[in-house]
Amino acid sequence: MAVTVLPSVSGLSAVASSSNLRRLTSASNHRLTAIKSVTSTSSPPTPSSGVQRRRKNNDENRATVAKVVENPYSKVEAARPDLQKRLSDFLEEAREFVGDGGGPPRWFSPLECGAQATNSPLLLYLPGIDGTGLGLIRHHKKLGEIFDIWCLHIPVSDRTPVKDLVKLIEETVKSENFRLPNRPIYLVGESIGACLALDVAARNPNIDLSLILVNPATHVNNFMVQPLSGMLNVLPDGLPTLLEDIFDFGFKQGDPLTGMLDALSNEFSVQRMGGVGGGMLRDVLAVSANLPTLSRMFPKDTLLWKLEMLKYAIASVNSHIYSVRAETLILLSGRDHWLLKEEDIDRYSRTLPKCIVRKLDDNGQFPLLEDGVDLATIIKCTCFYRRGKSHDHITDYIMPTTFELKQQVDDHRLLMDGTSPVMLSTLEDGTVVRSLEGLPSEGPVLYVGYHMILGFELAPMVIQLMTERNIHLRGLAHPMLFKNLQDSLVDTKMFDKYKIMGGVPVSHFNIYKLLREKAHVLLYPGGVREALHRKGEEYKLFWPERSEFVRVASKFGAKIVPFGVVGEDDICEIVLDSNDQRNIPILKDLMEKATKDAGNIREGDESELGNQECYFPGLVPKIPGRFYYYFGKPIETAGKEKELKDKEKAQELYLQVKSEVEQCIDYLKVKRESDPYRHLLPRMLYQASHGWSSEIPTFDL
C-alpha cells in the first residue's frame, strides 16, 4: 500500500521498513502530487446558480473568456456511489503491513487522504484487534476530503503494553494540539482502539477532543475468551507457520486455483450482481484467497497478547470513565456483540457528558468494512463535524455529494412520482412560467411560504431547485430536528435528510449569518403550528403578528420570494388531530412528552402561533392528486435598509409578503381545477403513451 510518510512524532517512526522506505517515499510523492492536482468530484462546489460564468485572463492576448460551469446536480439520476475498497482490498494491503519486518508502533497517512480541505481537523485512527491501521480503508477517500487522517499501525510482533500505547497516542495528541491549538482532534477507535481513545481523553480533559467509538470493547466475554485462550495455549508453536507454508505453497504453486478464485470474485462482484449477495460472495472468496495473510496477522502468541491487552484496556477505561469530558459518538452494531454489552453502552451514554449513540442495526462486529456504512455521512447526519471549538451549522456544513442527493431522490421517489409536482415562477416582467427561471440566481435570497402538513412539500421543492437551477436551499428548521435524544419517541435517523440537505436550527442569529453568506434561505414563519395543523386548517397561515425577517433581509439587500403550495388535501386527510389525541389518555401522554422534548421556541407567545403541540397526526391516504408550487415575483430590499428600519414600513412589507403568499395559494387552488392531469389515472395514461420520463402537461398559464 502506498502511504504518506509522516515525520517522527514523539519517537514514532514512519510506516515503512528501512528496505522499502525509499520506494514508498518516491511513490508517495508522485501520487500525492497527482491527487492534489485533481479537483474532487465527490463534493461539488458551493452552488449559486444553475449556470455560472467565470472569467479568466489570457496571458498571451489579455482576452476575457467566458467559461460555462455545468450544474453538478443536473444528472443526479445517473449518480453512482463513490468507489469504495472492499474486504479483499483490506486483506491485500494488510499483506504489506504484516510483512513489514516488525518495529515499534507508528503513524501513517493513506494517500487517498491527500486532498483534504483547508483547516481540516486531525483524525487519528486507533485500530482494533488486527492492529494494521487499515480499518478505515473503505472510507479513506471520502473522509480524506474533510480530515487530515493519521492511522496507527501496530506490527504483529510488537508487544507494547496498553499503558505505553496510551502514552504514545497522548504524546501525539499533545504535540498536535500545541502546534495547532484551535484545531479539534478526532480519535476514531474500534473495539480495543476505542478503549485507548477513552483512556487518552480521560487523561487530557483540557484538550479539544472528539471521540468516535465503533463497537467499543466494554467487557471480556469469558464464555468465549477462556476456551479460546486454553485452546491457543495447547496448540504447538509451529502450527501457524506450518499452516502458512501450506497455504503459501497452494496459492503460489497453484496458479490455476488463484486464477479461478480471482475470476469468480470478479464474476460475482457487486456491479454484476447488483446487491449485497454478490458482495458477500466476493468477500468470502477474498478471505479464501488471503488465508496466508490472516495466518500471519494472527499467530498464536499475538492472539494471546491481544487477549491480555483487551482485559487490561477494558479495566483501565472502566476505572476512570467519569474523567472523560470529550464529546462522543458511539456506533453500535445490531449483531455480534462479543466484546460489548448494551448495558455498558447505556452507562457510557449517561456518564459521558456529550454522548450520541448511533445504532447500525444490520451490521456485525466490523461495520467499517461492511456495505451500507458510510462514516463520513454518519458524521454529517449527527452534526459531529467541526473545524473550531463547537459545531457551526453554517460554516461546518458539507455540501451533499451527487450520490447523497440521489439517495434523497430515491427515498422520496414514491411521493415525487405520485404527485408529479408542477412548479411555476414569476419573471421580472410579471410573466408566470412553468419552470424555475424566475428565481434569482445570486444570493442572498429569502424564500418565505406556506408549510404543508408534515412538510410534504419540502423534498420535491429542494430537490428540484438543486437539479434544475443548482440552487441550494438552507432551510430554517425547528431545533428539535437537531437534538440527539436517546430516549426519544421517534428514531432520530428520520431527521438525517434535513441535516444532509443543509437544514439549520431556526434563530435570528442563523438567519443573519446565512444572509450574510449570500445563501438561499428557506423560512416558514408558521413553523410547527403550520406543519402540524388541525382538521380544516389546510392552507391557513399561522404567522406572527409582527415582522420578524424584513429588517434582517434589508440589511443585506436580500430578495424576498413569496411562494405558495397546494396539494396536501389531494394526497391525505387528517382524521386524528391534536384535539382528538388530547382526549385519548395514551396519545395525550405521548403528545405531552414529545412537546416537552421538542421545546417551544415561541414560549410566552399568547397568540395561536405559540400553541406549538408536537404530535403525529393520524392521516388517511388518498389516491394521490398533484402538488403545485407557485413562486411569486421577487421583492427587492436592496437600498431600503434605512427605510425599513422604521417599524411601520417594515410591517407594511411584511404584510405584503404574507398577502402575496395567500394570493399564490388562492391562484393555485383555482387553477388546479382546470388541470386535466390533476388526478393519477390521466397522468399514468399520458406517461404510458409518451414515456415515463416525459413531463406531464398542466393547466394553461
Swiss-Prot record:
The EC number(s) this enzyme carries: 2.3.1.-
Compartment(s) where it occurs, according to its Swiss-Prot or TrEMBL record: Plastid, Chloroplast, Plastoglobule
Entry's family note: Belongs to the diacylglycerol acyltransferase family.
Signal peptide: none
A single BP term in Gene Ontology: cellular response to nitrogen starvation
Region (Disordered): 37-64
Stretch forming the transit peptide: 1-65
Alphabetized CDD domains for the sequence: LPLAT_MGAT-like
SUPFAM superfamilies in alphabetical order: alpha/beta-Hydrolases
Organism of derivation: Arabidopsis thaliana
A GO molecular-function annotation: diacylglycerol O-acyltransferase activity
Protein name, as recorded: Phytyl ester synthase 2, chloroplastic
Enzyme class: transferase
Main location: plastid
UniProt keyword list: Acyltransferase, Chloroplast, Plastid, Stress response, Transferase, Transit peptide
Superkingdom, natural source: Eukaryota
Function description: Acyltransferase involved in fatty acid phytyl ester synthesis in chloroplasts, a process required for the maintenance of the photosynthetic membrane integrity during abiotic stress and senescence. Exhibits phytyl ester synthesis and diacylglycerol acyltransferase activities with broad substrate specificities, and can employ acyl-CoAs, acyl carrier proteins, and galactolipids as acyl donors.
Null mutant phenotype: Plants lacking both PES1 and PES2 grow normally but show reduced phytyl ester and triacylglycerol accumulation.
Reactions performed catalytically: a 1,2-diacyl-3-O-(beta-D-galactosyl)-sn-glycerol + a 1,2-diacylglycerol = an acyl-3-O-(beta-D-galactosyl)-sn-glycerol + a triacylglycerol; a 1,2-diacylglycerol + a fatty acyl-CoA = a triacylglycerol + CoA; a fatty acyl-[ACP] + a 1,2-diacylglycerol = a triacylglycerol + holo-[ACP]; phytol + a fatty acyl-CoA = a fatty acid phytyl ester + CoA
